[in-house]
Amino acid sequence: MFKRKPNPFIAYELAEMKIRTGDLMGATRNITFGIANSDGEIVRNYYETQQPYSVPMKAAFTYLKGLVKINEDRENNIDAAISILNDALAIAPNFNLAKISIDALNAQKPTIQE
């Protein structure tokens, strides 16, 4: 379906599925396509809170980019993933899922032993 008529919505779903199955290169291709082909009017809806909300697709793809980064190397890419997720928040300050992910990643950072 994506090959016949590629669009950001299908690219998002494919990228999300590929992240879950460990195909990070495939997900990156879909994310790159999505970022390049998302204008400010296309939005992604999220329902993980009581009140559903929408963010620009570019923020949604940036969020997925952060997930790819952390899945590449969970120990060494925490700061890089947080930086990417902060980019998503800069695009959409109301992006609750990005905020939750940043908090979870900050909690995974090793504490400095004295």
Q: Residue locations for each model-derived region?
A:
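Residue-level recognition of tetratricopeptide repeat
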Residues: 7-8, 16, 41, 58, 67-70, 94-95, 104
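TPR alpha-solenoid repeat register
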Residues: 10, 43-44, 61, 98
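Flexible helix-coil transition and linker loops at the boundaries of alpha-helical arrays
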Residues: 1-4, 37-55
